[in-house]
Each structure stands twice: as C-alpha cells, then as structure tokens.
Amino acid sequence: MKNLILTLLISCTFSLYVVAQKTKNVQYLAEYTFNVKPGTKKINMSCLIPQHIDNIQHVDTLIYNIPPNRVYKQNGDRMVEFVIDSIEGNFVLEIYANLKVISNDSSNKKPQAISKNQSVYLVAEKYLESDQDAIIQQAALLKKNSELKTVQSIYNFVRKSLKYSGYNPKDVGALQALEAGHGDCTEFADLFVALCRASDIPAKVIEGYMIGYNVAMSKHNWAEVYIPELGWRVVDPTSTSFNRLENAYVKLTSNRTNPAIQNFHYYAYKYWGDPIEVLESIKTKVVD
C-alpha cells in the first residue's frame, strides 16, 4: 500500500513526510432499512452522499434503488432527498457508488491564498469553541514559530491529552472534550480544529467513512488544516502518525452542522403517521 516516502523539506530543521499511494478504487454501499407500521403515511429522507473533490476523490457511479426526488448541493455538500408516500410495508433504500480515492499526497496540492469564504474556518461555532478562554489559553501554550510546527504541536497535544473512550452518539464539543480528557473521533477532531482556529490557523472538521470497515467502525471524523506551504492538508487526530496517513478516507462533508439533516450526522428523516425505525448499514471495500 505504501509505495514510496516523499520528503518535503519545509525548513532546514523540520521535515514533513507524506506517503504517496496509488489511487484506490472503492465500492460504497449505504443501506437504510425502514421498519414501518400500518399507519405510516409518508417518509422524507435526506442523506449526505459522496461527491467529486479535486485531489481527494472522484465519483464514477452513483445508483439508487429508489428514484430520488432531488439531488442537490447545499453549502458545499452533495445531498439526496427521497419522499416516499406509497408505503406497503418494510423496505430498504440503497445508495451505491464507485469512487476513486486519491492519495493524501502533498505533491498533489498547490499553495493558494485563503479565500473570503474559507475565512469561516477561522471563527468559533457550535462544538468548535475557539473563543473560549480555556481553548485560547491552551492554544497559546502550543504556539510555535511556524504554522506547520504549531499544527504538529496541537496534534501531539490532542493525542496525549484525550483518551479514546469509544463511540458516543452525543456531541459534546471541543471545550468539554478538553475539560473531560476523553472522547471519540468527533471530540478529537473538534478539539484539534478549535485549537487551530484559536491559533489563527484555518481548520475544519471532516465527516465521512474509513474504507474497509463495518458500520460500527466506518463512520469517522478527522480534520483538514490550511498550511501556507501546502494548502489544505488532511490530519487525523486519532491516527498514531501525523506525517503518514493511510489512503483510506471517503469524505462527505466539511460542515460541522447541517440544517438540511437537522444538524444530525450523515442523514435525517421525518415521518407522518405511525413512527418508524431506520437501521443503517455502510459497507466500503477496495476493488482491483
């Protein structure tokens, strides 16, 4: 999987190693099982779906077993909406995609100025409380003499200060993660991004899937951070390596909250009539 190690000399005293890997062909299957009752009249389902992102991933095929009412973009996300009003019992909604996941290789990146619309990645928001005193004070302690060194300092701090406590369906945010000292991948990403923003370094939380895991492990949050020499770079605060990331991420969104899915993760639904149950299964695998 790892074909060569590319060394980028950022300065005479610091080097950043990134692993150049082959593009991976990935099959993605999302299955949503709807368990309904006789009195269920209508269901509205909205989902995040993979999209083409330069130097990150290409979507070659996208197939639905139930025709969607609309596929649209909102705040940079690709969304699909289903309105189901002819319900004759339990059913399964399938979303199938073929993707090419591109190497996390800084040689693919070209430095560019931060744009006005990207300045939102410098401000505090819900779950990313970069304006709170505890976050600001900790960020000041981690500050180094370059953005790259500061980012690595923040990464090291998050790795050492947070204990991975297993999946928690409740979002608590960066501030509570810092105070509690534990969390899942969401809290790791939230704290990393909040500390970067408090250091005046643009950063964002990424939500998506890890390739080749079952649903319990597949959902994942990581981060992207803007480094002037490299542009936007992927950083996974739960990874044991800052420099060498496996080419194993399917990106869905860089919005920490999304009103289109009621600020939930991945999908949201509404129903009319009797209540329903929705069971989710996500499968990703690498194919030749």
Feature locations, PLM:
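Sec/Tat signal peptide C-region and signal peptidase I cleavage site
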Residues: 16-20
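Bacterial N-terminal signal peptides
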Residues: 7-15
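Hydrophobic/aromatic-rich core segments of domains that either
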Residues: 188-266
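Short intrinsically disordered coil segments
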Residues: 61-64, 109-118, 237-240
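Secondary-structure boundary elements
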Residues: 97-183, 191, 198, 258, ...
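Positively charged n-region of N-terminal signal peptides that target proteins for export
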Residues: 1-4
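Intrinsically disordered, low-complexity N-terminal segments that are enriched in acidic
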Residues: 21-103
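Extracytoplasmic/lumenal soluble domains of exported proteins with redox or metal-associated functions
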Residues: 45, 154, 180, 247-248, ...
